[in-house]
Amino acid sequence: HATIRRQRQMCIRDSNKVKPNTYKVIKDHPRLIIPFYDTTGKIFAFQGRAFGKEQPKYLTIKLDENKQKVYGLDKVNFQQPIYITEGPIDSLFIDNCLAAGGADLFLKNKIPNENITYIFDNEPRNKEIVKRMYKVIEQDFNVVIWPEDLQLKDVNDMIMSGLTKLELQDIISNNTYSKLSALTKLKYWKKIKEV
């Protein structure tokens, strides 16, 4: 754990020196620094998340360009069912959860698709999210399709509104679909005509 502690200190102390002249300097905003660890506990990337409406919302620096940007690899048990959220903060509220874009490619052949459940943001009018939901369903992954009466945008908003972790897990469990049932549910959930 001393190695991890040293890596965390390096992340905080030298975040602006890791890859000099690689990233354009933009207007500075306060950001939460989120370290990404691999399965051995070694940092391979870190991400700065804006607190307000600043754009870009996320700035990511990868120390190893060959690794996919997947958060939570150091904590997940690949022998158990895995959840995948869009963002690292959402993943903190769900047991055995990763956060990633394109994680389906990363996890191929590691565990069966039916043991992976994607949890996208609750945005039925977002064409990109709906398109990604169709893609993971076609690849035989499970997907959470939020109930229509739930008006909160993402897992973090749900927790901030007062839902407990257990209540959130119940909602996720009761609204996880796959294959034909997922396609049918998604057809009625989405609020856009074409994808």
Give the role of each language-model region.
Residues 52-63:
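A short, polar/charged loop-to-alpha-helix boundary motif
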Residues 1-12:
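Single conserved hydrophobic/aromatic residue that forms the stacking wall/gate
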Residues 7, 31, 79:
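Short coil/loop residues immediately preceding or within conserved phosphate-binding loops
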Residues 17-19:
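Flexible, glycine/threonine-enriched loop-and-boundary segments that flank and lead into catalytic domains
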Residues 37-39, 44, 56, 79-82, ...:
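TOPRIM fold recognition
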Residues 31-37:
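A short, hydrophobic, proline-anchored segment that marks a local hinge/packing element in signaling
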Residues 24-26, 69-78:
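A short acidic-Thr-Gly-centered motif at the start of a beta-strand
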